[in-house]
């Protein structure tokens, strides 16, 4: 096996493990999100859940859970939910910021490095 084949095999194994990790996250977080949305959670509880879900929001199933929390608590904690929606957009949907008043957020990382 040459170097290129070995590298391809290693990358494939990492991709497979990442897919398993996302599957595990969906299984673990689905009942937690349901429980959170079925009660009047504190702002801190909602923010912690969204922090965890944001890490996996690139997966459509996790994004669905993320949106469920946002929709459930939008009217109760509007500032927090608006913040987490913007965090999602900055991380996973950067194109949606182009041409908006939030376009400057696309350059935050560059400003932090200076």
Q: Where in this protein do the model-derived segments appear?
A:
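Short, charged, low-complexity amphipathic alpha-helix
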Residues: 1-13
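Intrinsically disordered, low-complexity regions
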Residues: 5-8, 30-34, 51, 59, ...
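Generic low-complexity, intrinsically disordered sequence content enriched
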Residues: 12, 22, 109-110
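Amphipathic alpha-helical interaction modules
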Residues: 16-68
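Amphipathic alpha-helical binding modules
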Residues: 62-114
